Amino acid sequence: MQFTALVAALLSVAAVQAQRNPITITPQFDCGATNSQQYVARSGDTLTKIAQEIYHDVVGVCDIARANNLADPNRIDAGTPYTIPINCQTYDRNSCL
């Protein structure tokens, strides 16, 4: 009983500390972007199509592949959400191809 009360008290203190000192994590991408969006792939999508037609070439194919740890940038699955780095400082369009 005392152990349970102690654990509950410690968790309560930790929750209060977390509210007072929230941790903000800013994602970092190889292309220098510090922001991202989620894009759910549709049938017929490719990383090239996503980069060029949907994001108007403001991100490279290989930037998307790296952000999602894709071993094969030519293979993406419809219905799968992918992280798209936004506002890249540099664009990698071919090192992974």
From Swiss-Prot:
Residues 37-84 form the LysM domain. It comes from the Eukaryota. PROSITE patterns: LYSM. Residues 1-18 form the signal peptide. It is found in: Secreted; Secreted, Cell wall. Pfam families: LysM. Disruption phenotype: Impairs protection against host chitinases and developes significantly more pycnidia. The LysM (lysin motif) domains are small globular domains involved in binding chitin in eukaryotes. Mg1LysM contains one LysM domain. This is Secreted LysM effector Mg1LysM. The gene is Mg1LysM.
